[in-house]
Amino acid sequence: HSLRRRQRQMCIRDSLSAEDYTTDMKTHRYPDGAELEFARNMVLHAARAAGIAAFDTVFTNMADPDGFYRETRHIHQLGFDGKSLVNPRQIAMVNSVYEPTKDEVIKAQKVIAAIEEARIKGSGVISMNGQMVDRPVVLRAQRVMSLAKVSNLLDEEGNYIEK
């Protein structure tokens, strides 16, 4: 069990350098990042299959904060757990993409409360606002709440703190 626990604590990242990878592929870095999609998806799928975190590669164009923001939003949408950084000025931007919004936190709280109520009544599946709420939806809601907690977005009672 300790090996399994240790594996879960490890993280996998786009350890092949994006610069090395694009050179090996006989291409180079483009603003839209399309040249990295295959490698990103392979890393992400391998991490998910192993049950460990996945972090994207470094964004090397320090003169393009808008490009960094777009890329960070993209990798968040793909499902990466975070982004590798070499510049501390990028931390706030990554956090702004990954921190749940007030609406996401409120929705997650409602999902968790509703499924708990359903569990008490002996039901495993419910509907909220016309959407089915089952285990995957609950797991996503729990992840939102975990992210909110580690981002210090909740007070002691679990209420969202406005920044």
Language-model segments: which ranges?
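Structural preference for beta-strand elements that scaffold enzyme active sites
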Residues: 13, 51-55, 81-82, 125
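Non-cysteine beta-strand/loop elements that form the S-adenosyl-L-methionine
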Residues: 13-21, 43, 82-86
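Active-site mouth loops of central-metabolism enzymes
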Residues: 29-30, 57-66
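Alpha-helix-loop-beta-strand connector modules within alpha/beta enzyme cores
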Residues: 37-51
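Single conserved hydrophobic/aromatic residue that forms the stacking wall/gate
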Residues: 1-12
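Glycine-rich tight-turn/loop motif centered on a GG-T
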Residues: 25-36, 98, 102
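Short, electropositive alpha-helical surface patch
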Residues: 66-81, 138, 142
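C-terminal alpha-helical cap/extension of soluble enzyme domains
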Residues: 54-55, 62, 95-157, 161-163
